[in-house]
Amino acid sequence: MRPTEINPADYEQQLAQKVNSVQQAFKTFSMPALEAFSSAPLNYRMRAEFRMWHDGDNLDHVMFDQSTKQKYAVNQFPPASIVINEVMMKLLSLVKKNEVLRRKLFQIDYLSTLTNEILVTLVYHKPLEDEWLKEAKALRALLRDEFKIDIIGRAKKQKVLLDKDYVIETLPVNDRLYTFKQIENSFTQPNAGVNSKMLEWALDVTQDCQGDLLELYCGAGNFSLPLAQNFRQVLATEISKSSVAAAQDNIRLNNIENVTILRMSSEEFVQALNNERSFRRLEGINLQDYDCQTVLVDPPRSGLDDDTLDMIKEYQNIVYISCNPETLNNNLAVLSETHNVVRFALFDQFPYTHHVESGVYLQKR
């Protein structure tokens, strides 16, 4: 099914199928009851990207059918936020009529927030010169009559800012609002509503944890900042420079004082923890000052490498957020040698697709 054809009437059925699929995938383990967290059935995605198709004077957003690989025009995109749908058609109508802006336009990316900020990236197969900047500023001025919008231009080895390259998301988590700087072309959770539920679940499962929290793959601090209230200190690692910079900004924006971000991979952190290698990035930080009894991991689809698996087995509590049931299954086969799964959750980040986000909370036996 094409994402443009989703039907809200089918939502509960597709969620039930996912619940059954996840339960079957983990039936070889002793798992607690699965907690399922639903999504809004429409307008749940905070970001979207489209290729552009030029046909004479016409210009369309297009996607490609996964079965036939044929392109099809996208006039409205029901999974995306309302503001993305509103902006994409208004912007397209203006760009179509502007030769400077439309020529060799290859792709448009949209990043929005729950408070209706939106950042639009126009991607080109041509160098962007002063004339493009002038026309892009005029386009932004027209769109700002209706929208809280910024525009970026990208081309090969080129990124042109009109103002800023980020949006500020305000995310409700229980009875508190968290502010997150989300940078263009960096990873963010696509489904803000489900992300809030995922953070509330993580807060709930760790509410009685003692000591400090270690988080690997922390991104811009999506988990680190809300979870800081449950721990004395939070020590978090991330390899991406832009994500680390955003995380530092987010710490300041939320006035949180007990989170420390380290720019290093999980593999490097294991080396540092085992005194196998020294890092200048750890200057002024003594890992022995932390009493990390809980670890949170949110790894890529490939899951955890063997060294990281061996390392986290030493922790009393493990929160594992997974975007790939297959690698979670493989990793659980190792972790279940020392830990019991006491909470198990499905987060429907990607409705109407086969993709599943899940969470497990494990405690050492």
Curated annotation (Swiss-Prot):
GO terms for molecular function: rRNA binding; tRNA (uracil(54)-C5)-methyltransferase activity, S-adenosyl methionine-dependent; tRNA binding. Gene3D superfamilies: 2.40.50.1070, Vaccinia Virus protein VP39 (3.40.50.150). Its EC number is 2.1.1.-, 2.1.1.35. S-adenosyl-L-methionine binds at residues 189, 217, 222, 238, 298. It catalyses: uridine(54) in tRNA + S-adenosyl-L-methionine = 5-methyluridine(54) in tRNA + S-adenosyl-L-homocysteine + H(+); uridine(341) in tmRNA + S-adenosyl-L-methionine = 5-methyluridine(341) in tmRNA + S-adenosyl-L-homocysteine + H(+). The active site is at 323 (nucleophile), 357 (proton acceptor). CDD domains: AdoMet_MTases. InterPro entries: MeTrfase_TrmA_AS, MeTrfase_TrmA_CS, SAM-dependent_MTases_sf, TrmA_MeTrfase, U5_MeTrfase_fam. Keywords: Methyltransferase, S-adenosyl-L-methionine, Transferase, tRNA processing. It holds the Pfam family tRNA_U5-meth_tr. GO terms for biological process: tRNA methylation. One of its GO terms (cellular component) is cytosol. Belongs to the class I-like SAM-binding methyltransferase superfamily. RNA M5U methyltransferase family. TrmA subfamily. Dual-specificity methyltransferase that catalyzes the formation of 5-methyluridine at position 54 (m5U54) in all tRNAs, and that of position 341 (m5U341) in tmRNA (transfer-mRNA). This is tRNA/tmRNA (uracil-C(5))-methyltransferase. It comes from Pseudoalteromonas atlantica (strain T6c / ATCC BAA-1087).
